[in-house]
């Protein structure tokens, strides 16, 4: 009996000990699970998020910018974060130097229609002092001046209040654009894409207000007869019927391959597009001018995570290879600066030069029927932090850009009017123009050279660095500084301030 009682107590004690151990183990597992949940807590946004900033920026082309811009994001329950369910972008601004006005409203969503992506926007730009640099980039000017292109051409031909009163590269344009693009799924990461764009252009001489340039009470305008815009019309390089602008109805269709982990600032993945963009009608109804065209466009973007595990996040090496070329017809003068994109990341996508393509060049400095370019940059996050319940990070992006013309614009007409491949404007050396009163004088012996076909195939290169401040991984403020290595294209220190990475 005694042995039985001892055995019973032993079994009861063992059971109690086992139960206590199970409770202790469960408690420990609960604590560990709580710790792990805390450790694995990640950024998440739900509902609406707003980003708005004043457009207090500066650019060499347009001067100081005043106005506001921003993005509106809707994340819903946060399950798609950092990608929003819906994104609305907008801007309203004015530039002091070029007197440009910009108004922009855009919508982008992958979730409005299941299985499809919708991108649509409205844009209006008024440019009373738009700069037209000529055709075919490096060929459109020559370094045959006493000093660099920067120190001579820009001050003399762009400054008001000097004698002569000339802005040689000046003209005006107003642009209205409405676009809508749709993408649908074909297979994993592979989409079809199609869209339609409507453009309306109004071109003219400069619309500059008369000013008292010399302080004597006499108000004057720039000399509208001494401009490259007028010279190209006289030579037939800008055709009769298109010199006042026109309308274009473009359609595009192609394929998109996308494996990016985050759209606004990918850490890894590929984003590639191949499509055709054409205008069955591009003309001016009032003049009867019509010049339909078809372009082929290929873009390849690759984002490579560098796993060195720094606290702010791994650096990313990103590069873009791009090519677009007219393969049928001829692009009208008022459309030649356009770079068609399936997904419009910025308000304006124009020209071989400036923030959209080759940083370090003046805006729309290269105009050609075919262009190829490459952009490379290293995106390095310096620090991330949380402020006002928003997630921020600070990053830098040193970069190198390069490009080349693959198909010149209207080279056949240029060959006919040029002498040994060179084109001159003798008005620039006329005795009727008193250069002696200008702040910076043209070099003695300058012969008025404005085009040299031998430079068409020159490789264009630039380099610089950017600074990024990102909120919730989507609203990204960008400031970039660059310098062009080509003497005849160098416009001094280039500054670009806006939103988003370039690609």
Language model features by range: what are they?
Residues 22, 37-49, 76-86, 112-118, ...:
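Short loop/turn motifs that connect adjacent beta-strands in outer-membrane beta-barrel proteins
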Residues 43-50, 57-247, 252, 485-502:
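Gram-negative/organellar outer-membrane beta-barrel architecture
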Residues 52-54, 88-92, 118-122, 192-194, ...:
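Membrane-embedded beta-strand positions of outer-membrane beta-barrel proteins
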Residues 58-60, 72-74, 92-98, 111, ...:
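Transmembrane beta-strands of outer-membrane beta-barrel pores
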Residues 68-90, 250-302, 464-479:
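Surface-exposed extracellular loop regions of Gram-negative outer-membrane beta-barrel proteins
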Residues 135-143, 208-219, 289-291, 295, ...:
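Flexible, surface-exposed loop regions and adjacent strand-edge segments
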Residues 262-388, 406-408, 415, 425-436:
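C-terminal outer-membrane beta-barrel translocator/porin domains of Gram-negative envelope proteins
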Residues 321, 468-503:
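Predominantly the C-terminal beta-signal and adjacent terminal strand-loop region
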């Amino acid at each position: 009996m005694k042995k039985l009682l001892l055995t019973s107590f032993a079994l009861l004690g063992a059971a109690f000990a086992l139960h206590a151990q199970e409770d202790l183990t469960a408690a420990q597992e609960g604590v560990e699970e709580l710790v792990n949940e805390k450790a694995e807590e990640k950024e998440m946004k739900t509902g609406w998020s707003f980003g708005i900033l004043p457009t207090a920026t500066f650019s060499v082309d347009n001067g100081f910018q005043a106005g506001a811009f921003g993005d509106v994001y809707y994340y819903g329950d946060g399950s798609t974060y950092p990608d929003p369910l819906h994104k609305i972008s907008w801007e309203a601004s004015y530039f002091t130097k070029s007197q440009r006005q910009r108004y922009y409203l855009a919508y982008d969503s992958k979730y409005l229609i299941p299985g499809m992506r919708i991108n649509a926007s409205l844009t209006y730009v008024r440019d009373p002092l738009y700069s037209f640099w000529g055709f075919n980039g490096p060929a459109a000017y020559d370094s045959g001046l006493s000093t660099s292109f920067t120190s001579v051409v820009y001050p003399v031909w762009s400054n008001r209040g000097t004698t002569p009163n000339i802005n040689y590269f000046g003209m005006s344009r107003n642009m209205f654009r409405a676009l809508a693009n749709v993408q649908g799924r074909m297979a994993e990461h592979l989409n079809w894409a199609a869209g339609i764009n409507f453009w309306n252009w109004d071109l003219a001489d400069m619309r500059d207000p008369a000013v008292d340039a010399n302080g004597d009470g006499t108000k004057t305008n720039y000399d509208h007869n001494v401009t490259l815009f007028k010279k190209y019309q006289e030579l037939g390089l800008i055709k009769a019927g298109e010199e006042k602008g026109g309308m274009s109805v473009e359609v595009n269709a192609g394929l998109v391959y996308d494996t990016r982990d985050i759209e606004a600032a990918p850490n890894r993945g590929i984003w590639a597009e191949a499509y055709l963009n054409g205008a069955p009608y591009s003309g001016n109804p009032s003049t009867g001018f019509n010049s339909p065209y078809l372009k082929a466009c290929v873009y390849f973007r690759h984002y490579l995570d560098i796993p060195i595990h720094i606290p702010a996040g791994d650096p990313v090496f990103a590069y873009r290879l791009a090519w677009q070329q007219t393969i049928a017809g001829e692009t009208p003068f008022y459309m030649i600066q356009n770079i068609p994109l399936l997904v419009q990341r910025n308000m304006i996508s124009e020209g071989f030069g400036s923030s959209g393509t080759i940083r370090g060049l003046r805006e729309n400095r290269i105009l050609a029927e075919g262009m190829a370019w490459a952009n490379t940059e290293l995106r390095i996050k310096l620090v991330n932090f949380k402020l006002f319940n928003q997630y921020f990070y600070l990053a830098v992006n040193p970069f190198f850009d390069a490009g080349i013309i693959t198909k010149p614009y209207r080279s056949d007409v240029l060959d006919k009017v040029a002498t040994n491949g060179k084109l001159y404007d003798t008005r620039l050396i006329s005795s009727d123009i008193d250069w002696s009163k200008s702040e910076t004088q043209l070099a003695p012996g300058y012969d008025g050279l404005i085009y040299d076909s031998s430079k068409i195939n020159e490789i264009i290169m630039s380099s610089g660095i950017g600074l990024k401040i990102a909120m919730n991984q989507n609203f990204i403020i960008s400031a970039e500084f660059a310098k062009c290595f080509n003497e005849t294209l160098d416009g001094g220190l280039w500054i670009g301030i806006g939103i988003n990475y370039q690609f």
